[in-house]
């Protein structure tokens, strides 16, 4: 290619779109840092012993249009049959007002988990609506704000039964009519936590001594029957009962809470979220009041702010992994907030009457087909059903299944039966085509409808029909026109801070650009419309995509094989530690159960180790934030015979490249252990070093950090794991398609949240080797620039041997608090007045702020943040000098709202302008928190996790 063609080409255009600082700005930043070139900065930052000797072998980057064209060709390899497979996954109509204004809206998908409630009231309200929806439809007293998928929710429920129950048994019962993918994940969890699992017909539950039981309602084969007596009988033996249920079925069926269930779990997928070949989807869990403090996952609660006004927040956080570490109720970190919001908006938009109409239509179509099949001489497995029929087809099974495929229809195949599940997208013409497969040509559906309609709910036993009301709160009975719904969505969106407003400098979270070109394919029907258990030849596009992405990730990480199954980073950690333990077991070393974890580690690390029955041994860090090599050597020697592994993060959670990391790996390997390298900080490795090159054996990657899947306000995420070849046989398997074996599944679907894989594929394809490496260098440049600008004003806790940091830095507020009385929380809240999300508070060191600007923020935004932090330091000085009292200053009173600005009274020693417009930039583009500082203690002492009365919403 000629030099001119290269100059005019667009293949590298995306790189400068993704990276914030223009190349012309680099020199100014380097001058501030004290480096002559970017390469000099990298050499002073990344230890030479771990720098890659040659570039990654990846294709050159593509332009946005070229990438989209190539990805469209891949997507078109998928075959979109009409799916009647069911099994927890259903086609659905995503209301366009939700599709455009939530799923495709960066105001919703680029927000972070709502740890800062003052700037998160919109999505907190949406998640509270989700909890209310789940509570109403299940008939239980409290619900969480989503889990990863139905199968992992069932596994979490199993452990909740053990924590919350009084039975001394170590056995968990699973009914034989539970979805097989759910059973597979439960078996994995049970094996490594030390439980036994019994699978039997639910009628035999009473003959077993078990601490918990999982039933399905309706069953996987479609049967509807009252479980009340069965549950009551189980309770007499101190058995807690979990029921996996269906939200749409619960509109017409007696809710499981009214039957006595202790816990309900399931998927909210069919409430407007595409199947997406398995995800992402929001799972749900609801429980009795008595189990609330043991329930896993985020829970949204109602509290008050400093002015006594209602404010929402994440409640009961002290039970979560980032607080309790190895004693946490779960390792859950990322959940499925964006998808939970979509499901809650689906319920808000349709309301109870709309949902009843949808449920009635689905059931009516099922009854029509049941009538037609029985009239034609087919026998049904069950006479009572909601949306699923199991047809006894005996010797005709293969013939009918193949005939259906020829008509572009997917049925669920059993040995001598066929399953048919209906959904809201089913039409009358679909029924005609389907019945023709069974030899019923030109079916008179209108005649059948009239006949079935004489007793519309004959297929639902009287005692299983719902009589209780649901979704009575005004929020579910108001926004039914598109105009109303649009304004409600926009009202909530406007309450929240996202990347559309400014930088989110959260350390360890990598809130980088989620480019529109990366996001576009997520809503393509070729990716969204495939059932995860469709025949593999119909998912050829997904197979191509997964193979390509795994190859890219292997090259980037230095690993030999990848599994894309884990639905989050925490799930990836879990799968990785299982691979290690299975490897030890295969070598006769099943006794190796000690996991070494540095004191700086993220809370998921010890929580995950506990989930696989490991003994956590903490390794000290030295005064520079590095692993204490003397303490490490002592711990290895002490536990050598039982050493399983070490979990490290690189660069360390303290934000520095530890120069002795290879020595750490060698020491653990010499003692027979494996090295788990947490991929949370991969954004500082790509193209410069890699986990495999460093010497680790297994890592998870947070695709929602380094590889551009958006955080979604608390999910979705993906945590695929890469391994060296010796661990490859121990990657997660799956029951439905046999890829990599059939055991040790960690997610309901083999490719986990498959429909968001195109985001990471697109990012890598557009950046190429040069762009990815450049992004890492710019992330390091940005972080060091911020550090050097702040260092004269704030102590920086840890730096490398040359005074550099990796991609994030820790600002130590403790000495400033001693001098001024102002805390890290005060600074975090005051940043909201300047138009910023707070950095990470008190992690990994209490009393600190951790800042990660990422490569996507430009120089002007970095300066705006630094100027805000410097201005806040000057405000702290005024408190220190007595100009402002400690109990009445703009920091302790932050954040300030529009109501504060308009208030008739003002009893503060600073002006309204100082309060609300502390910088010139805040005047130009002001973001307003909608509540004052939220009272966390009040919220936990007065726990309310349901929608408040409408009066509380009036403004």
Swiss-Prot record:
- Asked if Oxidoreductase is a keyword of the record, the answer is yes
Question: What are the alphabetically sorted keywords of the record?
Answer: Oxidoreductase, Pyridoxal phosphate
Stored InterPro entries: GcvP (IPR003437), GDC-P_C (IPR049316), GDC-P_N (IPR049315), GDC_P (IPR020581), PyrdxlP-dep_Trfase (IPR015424), PyrdxlP-dep_Trfase_major (IPR015421), PyrdxlP-dep_Trfase_small (IPR015422)
- Give the SUPFAM superfamilies listed for this entry: PLP-dependent transferases (SSF53383)
Q: Which Pfam families match?
A: GcvP2_C, GDC-P
Q: What class of enzyme is it?
A: oxidoreductase
Q: Which cofactor does it need?
A: pyridoxal 5'-phosphate
Q: Does the keyword Ubl conjugation apply?
A: no
Query: Which EC number applies?
Result: 1.4.4.2
Residue positions where N6-(pyridoxal phosphate)lysine is found in the record: 705
Q: Write down any Gene Ontology CC term.
A: cytosol
State how it assembles: The glycine cleavage system is composed of four proteins: P, T, L and H.
Q: What is the name of this protein?
A: Glycine dehydrogenase (decarboxylating)
Gene coding for it: gcvP
